[in-house]
Amino acid sequence: MRIASCSTARTARASNRGELRRSQNWIGGTRPGNAVFVPPPPDHVADLLADLERFIHSPSPELPLLVRIALVHAQFETIHPFLDGNGRIGRLLIAALLENWGLLREPLMYLSGYLKQHQMEYYRQLSIIRTEGNWESWVSFFLEGVASAAAEAERSIIAIASLVAEDRRRLLAAPKAGPASYRLFEMLPMMPRFMVEHARQALDTTFPTASAAVKMLEELSIVAEVTGQKTNRNYSYAAYIELLTR
């Protein structure tokens, strides 16, 4: 969703990042008069965010938590409190509330992929809240997104666990593999891109030992060198990263 604004607001974006907007912005069109959506005036933003914060922290037992998250996200995007980055922050807010309200123990599910895949419908659903007051349709769309993202997260977790288990099996079966290579392999999910010096520090060992451990993993095609250089070489657990970024 492109945010159009006057030239002074465009100039202010870089210098006012993280600050509440002090000028009027709008979405689509060349001016507020022909815009697709015009957020509240800047002098209302602080009070509207305060209301939203009170809603987040107030007990609402009559509303399921996922429904509350749907309402919070839509309201945040409607307030549009910043000149830039509102979409990213709004999506992060979903993940933060899922974890903070105990629906996820870890941030393992993100709706960003679903919302990007259904971008036009996402914008349409937000629009009909504002034009028709149709919150039910938005909540239904949001919950469908949660179900889809949860299923995709489950598939990704299974794929990642299968990859790690298979690579571990191959490493344990390798006759020349030693303790340092085993330990380094178990660290890969926490540092899927690294240099030999990083491995040395993580293993708390000598450079030759760390280098041999990396070489073992490279020979098994678990990691691969990605720079093509003879010095300052970087290694990547590429298959793992690919699954994470799918």
Task: Please annotate each region the language model reported.
Residues M1-R246:
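FIC/Doc superfamily catalytic core
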